[in-house]
UniProtKB/Swiss-Prot annotation:
Matches recorded under InterPro entries: Ribosomal_uL18_bac-type (IPR004389), Ribosomal_uL18_bac/euk (IPR005484)
Record's subunit section: Part of the 50S ribosomal subunit; part of the 5S rRNA/L5/L18/L25 subcomplex. Contacts the 5S and 23S rRNAs.
Primary gene name: rplR
Organism encoding this protein: Aromatoleum aromaticum (strain DSM 19018 / LMG 30748 / EbN1) (Azoarcus sp. (strain EbN1))
Keyword Nucleotide-binding found: no
Signal sequence range: none
A Gene Ontology term for the protein's cellular component: cytosolic large ribosomal subunit
Keyword rRNA-binding tagged: yes
Name recorded for this polypeptide: Large ribosomal subunit protein uL18
Alphabetized UniProt keyword annotations: Ribonucleoprotein, Ribosomal protein, RNA-binding, rRNA-binding
Lineage: Bacteria, Pseudomonadati, Pseudomonadota, Betaproteobacteria, Rhodocyclales
PANTHER family: 39S RIBOSOMAL PROTEIN L18, MITOCHONDRIAL (PTHR12899), LARGE RIBOSOMAL SUBUNIT PROTEIN UL18M (PTHR12899:SF3)
One GO MF term attached to the UniProt entry: 5S rRNA binding
One example of a Gene Ontology biological process annotation: translation
Length: 117
């Protein structure tokens, strides 16, 4: 198994538990250049809010989309958009990524923005 398959295997366990609870989830995906966050409803079929470093308004604020500063900006933005969509509490789905670095920075910024998890 390669690195990606191992990560997805870890993610499957978390997603199964979140799906069982039917809770709204905040999912994170990261690449070397960008970080993405989505708030997905309990059924897993609708995206309620999304934010990423690919967006023009976010990209204009940052020189680089692949660092902790960018993750903090995306975390605050996803919290604002989720609250605007009426979401207060979420389950954090780190998609098998370690809770460290950019993933941790995004999560902490989302908490500061008012999301509860």
């Amino acid at each position: 198994m390669n690195k990606k398959e191992v990560r997805l295997r870890r993610a499957r366990k978390t997603r199964a538990k979140i799906a069982e609870l039917k809770s709204v989830r905040l999912t994170v995906f990261r690449t070397n250049s960008h970080i993405y966050a989505q708030v997905i409803d309990g059924s897993g079929s609708r995206v309620l809010a999304a934010a990423s470093t690919v967006e023009a308004d976010v990209r204009s604020q940052l020189p680089n989309g692949g660092n902790k500063q960018a993750a903090q900006v995306v975390g605050k933005l996803i919290a604002e958009r989720a609250k605007a969509a009426g979401v207060e509490a979420v389950a954090f789905d780190r998609a098998g990524f370690q809770y460290h670095g950019r993933v941790k920075a995004l999560a902490e910024a989302a908490r500061e923005g008012g999301l509860k998890f």
